[in-house]
Amino acid sequence: MTLLNIAVAGSTGRMGRTIMETIADAQDLRLSAALEQPDSPYLSQDAGGLTGTPCGVIINSDYASALTGSDVLIDFTRPAGTLTHLAVCRQSGIHMVIGTTGFSAEEKEIIHDAAKDIAIVFAPNMSVGVNILFRLLEVAAKALPAGYDVEIIEAHHRHKVDAPSGTALRMGEVIAQTQGKNLEKVAIYGREGHTGERAADTIGFSTIRGGDIVGDHTALFAGIGERLEITHKASSRKTFATGALHAARFLATKKSGLFDMQDVLGLR
């Protein structure tokens, strides 16, 4: 069996550790590099020690050298770091799975451009359930008649730094596009004070941050006399790690191009 060599950026973070644990359980994958920032206290340690099973892969901050021999880099870090890693991968011909959120429109264009040379799966949420949720939102947004107010509510742990979440924004994009709208023109991010009546055809976003919530997302379609709620709740980061590794396997057969989890799961 030919093993797929996986490098993990942000390897000592919550997602990084979960991804490495999941790689260790897979028969067809091998952890080829564990990467961190230059000031990380974990540098030069065995990455497997973080998950209880030493593996001989040393945590490194030199991406250019550490990525030698890797097929795919999985990156759940922050936008600035991801773009730096992207430049190295593009130059080295290494594919990427990007789960980082919080990119600006201009930063997303950089990712789109890099996909001319390498294959990239770029998705705000890697879980199977959330990507089925996106399809259900298309069905609801298309089937429900005019007059239903749309609100998106998301909740995450206290450490999440961007709001609304990338998944919530993608939910809004799916609904807006299905209804022939531009999300930038109809989105309402939070409400405070005397706001007046709710404007028709807008999409509201509400954000909750607290504790160790892995990720809850709800789309509320509120009509007169009834409301429809479509909800996904993640109870473990393992679901995101498993999805990211599915994405890495998907990229093994690609030369270049930009994909998302709808492509990986055959939903498009």
Swiss-Prot record:
<dbReference type="GO" id="GO:0008839">
    <property type="term" value="F:4-hydroxy-tetrahydrodipicolinate reductase"/>
</dbReference>
<dbReference type="GO" id="GO:0005829">
    <property type="term" value="C:cytosol"/>
</dbReference>
<dbReference type="GO" id="GO:0009089">
    <property type="term" value="P:lysine biosynthetic process via diaminopimelate"/>
</dbReference>
<keyword id="KW-0560">Oxidoreductase</keyword>
<keyword id="KW-0520">NAD</keyword>
<dbReference type="InterPro" id="IPR023940">
    <property type="entry name" value="DHDPR_bac"/>
</dbReference>
<dbReference type="GO" id="GO:0016726">
    <property type="term" value="F:oxidoreductase activity, acting on CH or CH2 groups, NAD or NADP as acceptor"/>
</dbReference>
<dbReference type="InterPro" id="IPR036291">
    <property type="entry name" value="NAD(P)-bd_dom_sf"/>
</dbReference>
<feature type="binding site">
    <location>
        <position position="157"/>
    </location>
    <ligand>
        <name>(S)-2,3,4,5-tetrahydrodipicolinate</name>
    </ligand>
</feature>
<comment type="pathway">
    <text>Amino-acid biosynthesis; L-lysine biosynthesis via DAP pathway; (S)-tetrahydrodipicolinate from L-aspartate: step 4/4.</text>
</comment>
<keyword id="KW-0457">Lysine biosynthesis</keyword>
<protein>
    <recommendedName>
        <fullName>4-hydroxy-tetrahydrodipicolinate reductase</fullName>
        <ecNumber>1.17.1.8</ecNumber>
    </recommendedName>
</protein>
<feature type="binding site">
    <location>
        <begin position="10"/>
        <end position="15"/>
    </location>
    <ligand>
        <name>NAD(+)</name>
    </ligand>
</feature>
<feature type="binding site">
    <location>
        <position position="36"/>
    </location>
    <ligand>
        <name>NAD(+)</name>
    </ligand>
</feature>
<dbReference type="Pfam" id="PF01113">
    <property type="entry name" value="DapB_N"/>
</dbReference>
<dbReference type="InterPro" id="IPR022664">
    <property type="entry name" value="DapB_N_CS"/>
</dbReference>
<feature type="binding site">
    <location>
        <begin position="99"/>
        <end position="101"/>
    </location>
    <ligand>
        <name>NAD(+)</name>
    </ligand>
</feature>
<dbReference type="InterPro" id="IPR022663">
    <property type="entry name" value="DapB_C"/>
</dbReference>
<feature type="active site" description="Proton donor/acceptor">
    <location>
        <position position="156"/>
    </location>
</feature>
<feature type="binding site">
    <location>
        <begin position="123"/>
        <end position="126"/>
    </location>
    <ligand>
        <name>NAD(+)</name>
    </ligand>
</feature>
<dbReference type="GO" id="GO:0019877">
    <property type="term" value="P:diaminopimelate biosynthetic process"/>
</dbReference>
<keyword id="KW-0521">NADP</keyword>
<feature type="active site" description="Proton donor">
    <location>
        <position position="160"/>
    </location>
</feature>
<dbReference type="Pfam" id="PF05173">
    <property type="entry name" value="DapB_C"/>
</dbReference>
<keyword id="KW-0028">Amino-acid biosynthesis</keyword>
<dbReference type="GO" id="GO:0050661">
    <property type="term" value="F:NADP binding"/>
</dbReference>
<keyword id="KW-0220">Diaminopimelate biosynthesis</keyword>
<comment type="function">
    <text>Catalyzes the conversion of 4-hydroxy-tetrahydrodipicolinate (HTPA) to tetrahydrodipicolinate.</text>
</comment>
<dbReference type="GO" id="GO:0051287">
    <property type="term" value="F:NAD binding"/>
</dbReference>
<keyword id="KW-0963">Cytoplasm</keyword>
<feature type="binding site">
    <location>
        <begin position="166"/>
        <end position="167"/>
    </location>
    <ligand>
        <name>(S)-2,3,4,5-tetrahydrodipicolinate</name>
    </ligand>
</feature>
<comment type="similarity">
    <text>Belongs to the DapB family.</text>
</comment>
<dbReference type="InterPro" id="IPR000846">
    <property type="entry name" value="DapB_N"/>
</dbReference>
